[in-house]
């Protein structure tokens, strides 16, 4: 049963993107259920939407949700890293505003058959794009032990990554892992119970597998570059992330895009000739207030960063 989907940070997203003038073209690279886009379409009668998602089920839900604005919406099955090519294919030379809401969605987590959650039993799938070949089962049961250790360490930030990867390799040699509940129980058998106040260890393992299956960090790196290129001068990018790996990547990208000088430290004068490509109207992150967190627990970990493309 899918719980009603509540878009996180809906008010700040609507306010910051709604403040762009003129606001005629919005590209939502992670459309999901279309909650953020619906709010902006309702508030801006001239706004056109190009919505992209690699999950066809999400696109179907968004199409229904955005039915009242169908004449202003173009929905595309694809990856947001390819937004420049997708935009060009639909006659868009640029966008006034771009929104990226990174990571797994609540409906994906709520559907056991999608295999994203360790809290309910389902297949080891975790594909956002169900048409791709690579699944979590393939990663867990066939990746080499060294690759598994790297994935658990880098993507899950798991302290016992090598120990867990070795245990997985030994266990699967006897019998391959079949489902999410089995893997979650195995996590606790090998790694022990999570410490109070810390993320459950299965959460870290499942996060690592999901990021690997969907190539999420590479998608984000490429998507950020594509977004900056596609924005018109004066356009605005809003990015919502949910864990430190994503947020560090977004923060670093935006800070570098906003740097005026890239000379090595210590030079008496600037000789690089570099100019900032963007400005940061908000220093730091925007987070949910207590009222939103009370209504939607997932909002507690959401971080919104804003970047404007320089007008020249």
Name what the model sees in each region.
Residues 1-312:
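S-adenosyl-L-methionine-dependent methyltransferase catalytic core, i.e., the SAM/SAH-binding region
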């Amino acid at each position: 049963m899918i719980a009603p989907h509540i878009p996180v940070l809906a008010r700040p997203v609507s306010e910051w993107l709604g403040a762009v003038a003129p606001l005629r073209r919005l590209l939502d690279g992670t459309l999901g259920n279309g909650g953020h886009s619906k709010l902006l379409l309702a508030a801006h009668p001239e706004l056109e939407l190009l919505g992209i998602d690699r999950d066809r089920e999400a696109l179907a839900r968004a199409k229904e949700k955005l039915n009242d604005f169908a004449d202003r919406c173009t929905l595309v099955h694809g990856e947001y890293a390819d937004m420049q090519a997708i935009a060009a294919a639909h006659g868009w030379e640029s966008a006034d505003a771009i929104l990226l809401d990174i990571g797994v969605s609540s409906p994906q987590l709520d559907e056991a058959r999608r295999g994203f959650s360790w809290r309910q039993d389902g297949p080891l799938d975790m594909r956002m794009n169900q048409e791709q070949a690579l699944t979590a089962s393939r990663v867990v049961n066939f990746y080499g032990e060294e690759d598994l250790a790297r994935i658990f360490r880098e993507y899950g930030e798991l302290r016992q990554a090598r120990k867990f990867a070795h245990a997985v390799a030994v266990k699967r040699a006897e019998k391959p892992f079949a489902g999410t509940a089995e893997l979650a129980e195995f996590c606790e058998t090998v790694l022990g119970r999570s410490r109070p106040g810390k993320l459950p260890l299965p959460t870290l393992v499942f996060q690592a597998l999901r990021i690997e299956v969907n190539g999420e960090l590479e998608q984000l790196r490429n998507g950020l570059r594509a977004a900056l290129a596609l924005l018109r001068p004066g356009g605005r990018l809003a990015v919502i992330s949910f864990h430190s790996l994503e947020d560090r990547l977004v923060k670093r990208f935006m800070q570098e895009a906003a740097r005026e000088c890239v000379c090595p430290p210590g030079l008496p004068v600037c000789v690089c000739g570099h100019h900032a490509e963007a400005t940061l109207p908000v220093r730091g992150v925007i987070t949910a207030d207590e009222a939103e967190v009370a209504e939607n627990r997932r909002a507690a970990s959401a971080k919104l960063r804003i970047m404007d493309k320089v007008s020249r």
